[in-house]
Amino acid sequence: MKKIVMTAAILAFGVINYAQADTIRATSAFGPKHVMAQAGYPALFKKLKELTDGRWTGYDTPSGLVGPNEMNSALREGITDMGPVMFPYFSADYVESGIVGDLSMLGTDNRAIASAVSEYIATCPECIKEFSKNGQVYLGSDATTAYQLLSTKRIESLSDLKGLRVRTGGATYSYIIEKMGALPVYFPASEIFEALSSGVADATYSSIPDLKNIQLYDAVKYVTLIDKGVFNAAAMTNLSQRVWDKMSLEDRSSMARAAQYAQTIAIYSWRDTAAEAEKIAKEKGIEFIQPDKEFVKRGNNIRDEYMAGVTEALTKKGVTNAAAKVDSYKALLKKWEGLVANVTTSDELAELRYKEIWSKVDMKTYGSH
């Protein structure tokens, strides 16, 4: 009898604990096949549950609830609790944070780039204020591998590119594309497949893993290897301030730590998926093209021209102390290039990012109104 009573008590205690667990409603937003839906967010919530002893958990609705171009207001208004905020979609709201996108031509290692972005924004008071104004708390960034031209038309020379409509993910890429003679067009990543298939766009300025991540195999016929820039202007696991305010300081720290696991999985996925996507693409008949020397030279000259004028451009956009901030980001990128040199796994990178960035953040004041 005592054994039965004890068992019932244990079960009841477990039910009560489960009922009291707070649940985060996330929207990874890029569809069920995207790495954040398949691995990133699940890893985050598994780690969060572990670190908080079950006090917090969560689930992801990868599509259908909120699109990437709606995420800013969705987080602010409580439609969802967590999701990715793409700075170029809301450039007026993220003038200071968006500086990282303007500097996306710097660096080649996406592990170092993403970590430099994360540390820059997390330690930038003006940046954190931007998120707070929109009812959000910033918890880090990832970054893609190098960008190429994924197209429906063959692009080998500048004359091939001239006049084509190329989807870009922000002002930096639009500048490069326009200077090279094409017409930049702008719409969410979730609409790329339809735009290429219908002829609204002739190409997208994206990384090779996007062939898999957003299933472009049946829309793209050519990949021109230009290796210019990455996409680093996104906060992939932004949390609603409503949720953050409910968390204890210990749980806030756990949340920041768990979020790194989602982002570093994405970082390594970009690296791992590049080779896989290229292999599948070639099997499907997609042609990979090395552009001619004139194309390469023009691209390099435009990149250098862009970087020479970036401080002035940022100042005109409203970034305060732009020169000092550019120098700060460059220093962080150099620091992280050294730190990641011997990192071999996503978990190792997640813990390194937590140690170097989030363990040093004052969780009492971070993200506060």
Predicted feature residues:
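Positively charged n-region of N-terminal signal peptides that target proteins for export
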Residues: 1-4
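Bacterial N-terminal signal peptides
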Residues: 7-14
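Short, solvent-exposed loop/beta-turn-alpha elements that line the ligand-binding surface or hinge
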Residues: 107-133
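N-terminal secretory/targeting leader peptides
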Residues: 22-112, 138-369
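Sec/Tat signal peptide C-region and signal peptidase I cleavage site
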Residues: 15-21
